[in-house]
Amino acid sequence: MRIAFVVARVGEERNVIQRLSLVLADELRKQGENVDIFPFNRRKVFSFFSYKKLSNYDCVLISNVGLQCAYFSIFKRLGLVKKLFVAISFGSDIRATRNKLINLFNRISRPAIDLLIVVNPDLVVVAKSRGYKNVQYVPSWASALP
């Protein structure tokens, strides 16, 4: 399976989510999957044709339900991208109920996400209460990918 893995701001300064995402990409490669990392930054928001790069992939894996997820979800909702969308939530994006910008990203992304993988078992209830339908807690992340 060819997987396009969208990770926000991959560079020299990596936060915990970026490091975990790169570890996950390496684990998927060890299992024989073809994983390409797509770094996402705020400049990509103004590039309206970046979705065309996803046409050669079977699945789009997004490292967090944030701006990058909302951006590619718009293309899926418009019918420009017809790939399986899998998002991974590390908790900060799902739990942030007071942050209006993150709430907007969640509302945009929710209908386009085919599978939401959460890394903590308590996030299943939180995600379902926020309207996500197919939520799965996976101790071994790679086993949740179709």
Predicted regions and their residues:
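Short His-centered aromatic/hydrophobic patch
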Residues: 62-68, 89
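Short acidic/histidine-rich motifs immediately flanking catalytic phosphotransfer sites
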Residues: 54-59
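Nucleotide-activated donor-dependent transferases that construct or modify glycoconjugates
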Residues: 1-14
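Short amphipathic alpha-helix
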Residues: 15-28
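Membrane-proximal helix-turn-helix segments that form the acceptor-binding/catalytic region
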Residues: 99-116
